[in-house]
């Protein structure tokens, strides 16, 4: 009894299986390439085979999962085939497009086949794999398209902006009339992956100013076959039609390009300081002179040390023009000093150190003045003090000759020498005075630390009554004779007195 029950179950299972067994078979899917590339459109050919006579046959496709749905666009996703005899093939011609940014991945699509047999409707399906391996897209960019006349060492940026790997890369640069590639002009790179970059060092000799270009040729290999349809033909014999497709393997890619450069003089700008020497500890104007050898541009100049107030200024300078910018600075230490500046213009940045000489400034004053008079001659003695911050070299003090003041040798001038800050030197001057004089003009000359000749003028007042001397004796009083006579009289009186005392 139990055995009969088992046989009955097997019979029912086989009957049901016969009712749902497939009458078609998915034979293959063809897209005429080893791999699919992003951004390309492909013809898909899905072939089915019927085991029985079927009708109303329709084949369609849908992305199987979410990632496939995001990266595969169905352009034509359904094909009517209709009636098929037993063991007859049916081909569905469908069209898809791969997303331009599709990453390397084995995407999935599901092929469906709906048909009728008798009065029954059936549906079969199969999952197909679409391998997308990406397409390399090599781009060469200049990191700086500005060259100077003469030799230029530059870096070119080679980037694979595509989604596939490029292998056996070869780049060849070609000289032009005014731009020459020095050294080896051919570069090879084994491989460059997607979204990666590498630098190409290049030495270019530019002959003269202007805008010039060099051409380049780049070739590389895709690591898979890229079949490209080159010919399509149809042959019709009776009721049958044969379609012949011819493909060419395009896995070797060759491209050309142009790199354009602006060539300028060796120095885009010339920078000078109008006043390279300033005084220590004093707020001074620093005037920077800029000559534009480049092109009409707005210049922004920035200094980073010693500035007082604004440290950044801008000015528009035409090509060939020279203009000045003035900053206020203060430096509290003597010596040669560097002032770092940065100049921005037209996406250029130039950094320089401007050199200035910071010097002290001598300040000479007179002290300890003493005036002695003897007849018609004046003797002036005193000190010259340097109360400044700079050195005074070759200090010379002299009496200015006037109508009534005649300097007398060997003391008409006095050489003091070098006076350092907080140093002093003594001097002695002689002159002859005629007429009424109440002050004596003095001239002090010296050389500063930049060897510039400095002259200052001072006057010394005679602290007594105004000296009145005459060189002409006619009608005048001879004070020397009067003095001798007085002394003689005093002597005579003294001798008489001594004689009188002895007698007594």
Curated annotation (Swiss-Prot):
Gene Ontology cellular component terms for the protein in this record: membrane
Keyword list, A-Z: Membrane, Transmembrane, Transmembrane helix
Protein topology in the membrane: Single-pass membrane protein
UniProt subcellular location: Membrane
Pfam families: CARDB
Segments traversing the membrane: 6-26
Family listed: To M.jannaschii MJ1506 and MJ1561.
Protein name: Uncharacterized protein MJ0795
Highest classification ranks of the organism: Archaea, Methanobacteriati, Methanobacteriota, Methanomada group, Methanococci
């Amino acid at each position: 009894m139990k055995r009969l029950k088992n046989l009955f179950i097997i019979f029912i299972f086989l009957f049901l299986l016969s009712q749902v067994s497939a009458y078609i078979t998915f034979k293959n899917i063809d897209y005429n390439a080893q791999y699919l590339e992003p951004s390309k459109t492909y013809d898909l050919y899905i072939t089915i085979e019927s085991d029985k006579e079927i009708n109303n046959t329709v084949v369609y496709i849908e992305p199987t999962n979410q990632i496939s749905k995001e990266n595969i666009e169905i352009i034509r996703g359904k094909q009517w085939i209709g009636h098929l005899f037993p063991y007859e093939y049916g081909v569905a011609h469908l069209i898809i497009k791969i997303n331009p940014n599709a990453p390397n991945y084995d995407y999935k699509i599901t092929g469906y086949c709906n048909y009728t047999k008798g009065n029954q409707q059936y549906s079969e399906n199969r999952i197909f794999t679409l391998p997308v391996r990406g397409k390399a897209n090599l781009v060469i960019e200049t990191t700086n398209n500005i060259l100077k006349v003469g030799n230029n060492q530059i870096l070119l940026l080679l980037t694979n902006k595509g989604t596939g790997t490029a292998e056996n890369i070869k780049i060849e640069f070609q000289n032009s009339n005014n731009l020459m590639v020095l050294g080896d002009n051919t570069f090879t790179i084994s491989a460059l992956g997607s979204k990666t970059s590498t630098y190409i060092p290049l030495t270019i000799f530019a002959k003269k100013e202007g805008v010039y270009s060099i051409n380049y040729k780049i070739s590389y290999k895709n690591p898979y076959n890229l079949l490209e349809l080159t010919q399509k033909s149809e042959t019709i014999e009776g009721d049958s039609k044969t379609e012949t497709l011819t493909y060419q393997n395009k896995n070797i890619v060759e491209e050309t390009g142009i790199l354009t450069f602006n060539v300028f003089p060796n120095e885009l700008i010339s920078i000078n300081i109008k006043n390279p020497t300033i005084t220590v500890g004093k707020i001074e104007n620093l005037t920077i002179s800029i000559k534009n050898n480049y092109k009409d541009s707005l210049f922004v100049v920035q200094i980073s040390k010693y500035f007082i107030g604004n440290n950044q200024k801008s000015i528009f300078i035409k090509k060939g023009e020279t203009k000045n910018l003035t900053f206020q600075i203060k430096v509290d230490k003597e010596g040669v000093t560097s002032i770092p500046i940065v100049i921005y213009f037209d996406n250029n940045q130039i950094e320089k150190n401007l050199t200035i000489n910071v010097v002290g400034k001598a300040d000479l004053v007179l002290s300890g003045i003493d005036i002695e008079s003897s007849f018609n001659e004046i003797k002036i003695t005193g000190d010259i003090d340097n109360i400044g911050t700079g050195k005074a070299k070759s200090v010379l003090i002299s009496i200015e000759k006037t109508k009534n003041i005649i300097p007398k040798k060997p003391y008409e001038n006095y050489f003091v020498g070098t006076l350092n800050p907080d140093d002093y030197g003594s001097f002695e001057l002689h002159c002859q005075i005629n007429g009424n004089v109440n002050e004596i003009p003095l001239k002090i000359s010296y050389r500063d630390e930049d060897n510039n000749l400095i002259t200052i003028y001072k006057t010394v007042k005679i602290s007594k009554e105004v000296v009145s001397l005459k060189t002409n004796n006619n009608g005048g009083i001879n004070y020397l004779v009067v003095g001798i006579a007085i002394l003689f009289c005093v002597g005579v009186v003294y001798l008489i007195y001594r004689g009188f005392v002895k007698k007594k």
